[in-house]
Each structure stands twice: as structure tokens, then as C-alpha cells.
Amino acid sequence: MSHAFDKPVLHDVTISSTGELVVLVGASGSGKTTCARIAAGLIEADTGHATIDARLVCPGDVGMCFQRPQDQLFAQSVAEDIAFGPNNKGFSPDDVEALVAYAAARVGLDQQVMGASPLTLSGGQARRAALAGTLACATYAVVFDEATSGLDGEARSQVLHLARELANEGKAVLAITHDVSEWLPFADRVVFLEKGRVVADVNVQEAQTNPEIYEAAQLDCPLFVSVLHELLEACYV
């Protein structure tokens, strides 16, 4: 797919991720967020399109977890926020209630938090509420857009493990990040984007051991990647 605003942002980007956790990494301005929004059905590509199992993606098919939980929390109560997506899909009241209960239980939201205003939540509670809203919408796929940025260790771990679990359950999972290190233990593949183009689409092992990929994507190479590369080179000398 390709997309342009005042100038081209994406050029012939293809990412397949059914049942996988694919990490899309790139520097600021590389086109990551545009790719995420197309994948979630929020905007249309100028050429090409987003599909899941050959089916065109609609906004209601994909749950999207944004960097800022506040961008997903705007109703009078957390329960209403979680129900927003299923209600918009036209689900029956019973189905909406079941989805809200499932999503809340999965991220550990109790009844007190469910009845609270989003404005009163702590940072960790807000992230869990946003995750629950994402889960309630995630019919086929989930997009995490810088969803671990600024989180403490516990909240970050919850996001990462949830993403892995969703992929294991057969959903397509796309994680957008500028820092690939924390996602590598959970990922199946890593796609490196630079100036709107895919410069590498590799398995996790290669992303952990090949510094040249990071150079091609104009990214700082994580120290552990350089160390592993040197160790492997030494083993083959």
C-alpha cells in the first residue's frame, strides 16, 4: 500500500500478520503511525488497501491501542468507554455487556474502576481501561501504536504479554514502536521502515544479531545486538 499527504509517506508497504505479532519499527517520520492508521481502517491508502484473510479492513474489525490512554477515554464512565466500540458495531445489549465483562476481566478492572470517571484514574488504571476498550473492538486484529511508551515496568509488561497472547489466539497483531528492544522477546517478525519504505522484514533472531539492519533504517543499534553480533562473529572465526 502507499499513502501521501503533502508528500508521499508510504511507498509499497506490505505487511502480513495473521496469527503473528509483527513489530513495525522506524525513526520519527518514517511512516509508522500512518501505517498503523491504515492497518486499523482509520484512513484509506491512496493505492492498495489493508486486508485480513483477503477481507477488506473496516474500523470495526480492528482494536487500536494508542500511545495516550486519554485518546480512548472520553465517556462518563470506564464501562461506557469500553462499550463504545461494540455499541458502534451494532451489537445487541447482551453481547455488549458480555464483551465489556470479558475485556474488563482480562485486564483486571474491578467494579469500582468500571463505574469511575476516566478523569479520576491513575496512569496504570487508565492504561488498563484503554486496553479493555481495545479488546472489546478486536474482532480480527489489534494495532498497538507506541502503546508501551512512558509506562512503568508492570504496565509495560501487561501490554507486551497481552499482545503475545492475542497473537497466540490467532489474531493479527501489529505493534508500532521506535524502540524495538522490549518487543523482541514477544515478536514473530520485525519490519524496519525508513522514509516510508520497508528496508527489512526479518525474523526475531536476525533482528537480535544484525546491526546492519538498524543502520539501513537510520536507527541506533541496541547494545545487545552489537554484542551478540560480535560473539557470533568470534564463534565463526
Model feature map: region roles:
Residues 117-121, 125:
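Conserved ABC ATPase signature
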Residues 40:
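Helix-to-loop junction immediately C-terminal to a conserved catalytic motif
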Residues 134-135:
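ABC ATPase C-loop
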Residues 95-112:
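Conserved ABC ATPase "signature" region
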Residues 142-145:
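Catalytic Walker B motif of ABC-type/P-loop ATPase nucleotide-binding domains
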Residues 177-178:
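H-loop/switch region of ABC-family ATPase nucleotide-binding domains
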Residues 153-155:
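Helix N-cap at the start of a conserved alpha-helix in ABC-type nucleotide-binding domains
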